[in-house]
A protein has these predicted regions:
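A conserved amphipathic helix/loop scaffold
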Residues: 1-134
Length: 134
């Protein structure tokens, strides 16, 4: 076992989160400080240069980092130290997409891709989808 936190230098030094331990939850779900919910497992961790997005509001890791981000030049590294519920995971990804100027508001089965001035929408199920211009 190598001491110094889980994830090594990538997580600790680049992303900026020091992970001490991970564990399964006793509860079915736990609440995060931003209103999201996590399931199954989480990490006992602390910031090491990253910006806090959400911490565990309930459960054994209350007060520990659940989601963090760190600006690295013109990019942003995101860290998710838990498994979010399906609704929370979708909201998390949509929030990141919105920060990047990507429209991610379609159906769950619809993939939206922007290539230059073109927007391509692909429905991966047999749904009828109305697409509006703009």
């Amino acid at each position: 076992v190598k001491l110094g936190g889980y994830g090594g230098a990538l997580v600790k030094d680049v992303i900026g989160v020091y992970v001490e331990e991970f564990y399964p939850f006793r509860e079915a779900t736990v609440e995060l400080s931003n209103g999201y919910h996590a399931k199954l497992w989480g990490e006992l961790s602390r910031l090491n240069g990253a910006e806090l997005v959400a911490e565990f509001k309930t459960g054994q890791a209350q007060g520990s980092v659940a989601i963090a981000k760190r600006k690295l030049g013109s990019s942003t590294a995101w860290y998710q130290g838990t498994e979010l519920t399906d609704d929370s995971q979708r909201a998390f990804f949509r929030g990141i997409a919105a920060d990047l100027g990507i429209n991610a508001t379609g159906l769950e089965s619809t993939e939206v891709i922007k290539r230059g001035p073109y927007q391509i929408e692909i429905d991966h199920k047999a749904n009828t989808v109305k697409v509006t211009k703009g």
